[in-house]
Amino acid sequence: MVDNLEPLPASLQNLVEQDSLKWIFVGGKGGVGKTTCSSSLAVQLAKVRESVLIISTDPAHNISDAFDQKFTKVPTKVNGFDNLFAMEIDPNAGLNELPEEYFEGENEALRVSKGVMQEMINALPGIDEAMSYAEVMKLVKGMNFSVVVFDTAPTGHTLRLIAFPQVVEKGLGKLLRLKMKVAPLLTQFVSMLGMADVNVDTLSQKLDDMLRVITQVNEQFKNPDQTTFVCVCIAEFFSLYETERLIQELTKCGIDVHNIIVNQLLFLNNSHSSCKMCASRYKIQEKYLDQIADLYEDFHVTKLPLLEKEVRGPDSIKAFSENLMTPYDPKAKSKE
């Protein structure tokens, strides 16, 4: 038996080269650089995939700042790329976040169904946020992107995002079981309002379609060949604690996770020799890097540097993204 296993490659190359992946989530504690990492990963994926979509589910919507380009709730091509698209959604907005075109149709039924659906799901606690994810997933799946990268909100929101397929399946299951009782009442109601051309079956069909898609997404989320999670942290106690909690929750949910990014690391060089704060900071981070190495010996642990300037704009992200594929070497950088 071998006591000392070789550490896994310290990069995200394993994810970029895994052609079967459809959904990649990037998350962690607030302020650790999730958006920079998710944007950089999307840039690397765009080199080898036919089409890539990065979705921000963080209400702060930092990917617009990262790429220095305004994004909306509709997939928009990122400047400087032919096959990289980005969109931003606010899960707290529920179904109101969706493009109005989604609910338009030839008759009044589709337009009415948005309001009716919103009222119905409001009666089910906790499902509104999940339904907004569900509708976005339905739209995204219809666009057939090769891979989708999620730039998620801080940990609590992330766990709800991961769990949304189960929540929606359960909630929609209840609605569909009640639809035979509800449909006649809705038909009478819309008739009283003088909307005789409204077909309540349209609403029922929408729920059926959504449940079918979400069931499929739920199966894909729990398939390590199609879905994985990348945890981003910094070498500090609270961030490491949050990362461990996140990994435990992901494991409970059946979500694959075998990549960790440790961001904002200080790499000492000759210019730091007289800096007491730098030396102290370096000592602290080495302590937590040792803990990470012990805790996650079966993970790919990628170490990224703390830079003098912020990473902003397509060119900066392209340059920074190379650190995801090849371990950062401060000596090589100092020679450039």
UniProtKB/Swiss-Prot annotation:
Residues annotated for Zn(2+) binding in this entry: 275, 278
GO molecular function, a single term: ATP hydrolysis activity
GO CC annotations on file: GET complex
Pfam families: ArsA_ATPase
Keyword Repressor attached: no
Matches recorded under InterPro entries: Anion-transp_ATPase-like_dom, ATPase_ArsA/GET3, ATPase_ArsA/GET3_euk, P-loop_NTPase
EC number: 3.6.-.-
UniProt keyword annotations, A-Z: ATP-binding, Cytoplasm, Endoplasmic reticulum, Hydrolase, Metal-binding, Nucleotide-binding, Transport, Zinc
An individual GO BP term: tail-anchored membrane protein insertion into ER membrane
Active site: 58
Annotated positions binding ATP: 29-36, 236, 263
Location in or out of the cell: Cytoplasm; Endoplasmic reticulum
Family in the record: Belongs to the arsA ATPase family.
Function: ATPase required for the post-translational delivery of tail-anchored (TA) proteins to the endoplasmic reticulum. Recognizes and selectively binds the transmembrane domain of TA proteins in the cytosol. This complex then targets to the endoplasmic reticulum by membrane-bound receptors, where the tail-anchored protein is released for insertion. This process is regulated by ATP binding and hydrolysis. ATP binding drives the homodimer towards the closed dimer state, facilitating recognition of newly synthesized TA membrane proteins. ATP hydrolysis is required for insertion.
HAMAP family cross-referenced by the UniProt entry: Asna1_Get3 (MF_03112)
Record note on quaternary structure: Homodimer.
Protein name per UniProt: ATPase ASNA1 homolog
Organism of origin: Drosophila persimilis (Fruit fly)
The organism's taxonomic lineage, starting at the top: Eukaryota, Metazoa, Ecdysozoa, Arthropoda, Hexapoda
